[in-house]
């Protein structure tokens, strides 16, 4: 049900920590914002719902973006937001909205998931994905896929139609075939842009540029972010979604092609429940993007939930605190999260993150840069 605009609000600038990240926290809630993410739900006929997505965090700067390309990114994010909204507005379940949006992003060559997946060192594409139901705490994840068109669909089947949580490689694709999931020729994932990114990454490995001191760097050039590397520009693109449906259930999903030039079957945080994806109706739903190794080591997605459940922190406080832990050990990235009351946050410590949200008013909001 569409909430009355006079009673619905979007709070911005809640908490110094949120402001420090350059990204305010917001809420879809119709009533007063909760001070803690674990406070009892208030009875409300308005039944707020909300949907938040991301298309990856990384070195995303206006100076490198053409107007045409920026429009393409914004249009696809808007389309994905409306896909999730249509499910939630008619009273659909949270995970249907998550899958609807992520499938659209997986089918787009713009994002590092599905069709737009980056290449491994061997010149192949290896896809990872995960999904979690906050109501039941059931979860499904897949990794190392080479022929599954939409990994998020298979992750959900692992959750709902198998006794397992995670499947990988050939075994996962056998399961996909048995369940009727669409398989494609590996050539489907090829895009010239991603191929050229691989070539540049390999060349950078062979001929790394010399490090410059602060004195050698022009004043007009900003210093690199902590934890940044030469290949940061190839890391963004992971996609994810989190939502709160009208029944008060939370859900989260994430999908990625990993990192350009990865080797040896490397798997990042995206398919790791508790690191890249997590959902619990008692606290929040989270989807992450960034340096996967660091997000795994700090168990980002679950840590946010734990800080809320055991430490009494609000969603934005927990999200900021956890991302600070990532930065402290050298990691970069971002995340989206939403709690049981409709409060949500989208912090990141990179120069940009593709992100957006939509609520009962059906108005899609899309942001890319830090400012």
Give the residues covered by each predicted segment.
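Boundary at the C-terminal end of the N-terminal hydrophobic targeting segment
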Residues: 27-29
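N-terminal secretory signal peptides and thylakoid transit peptides that target proteins
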Residues: 1-18
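Alpha/propeptide regions of enzymes that mature by internal proteolysis
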Residues: 13-15, 19, 31-371
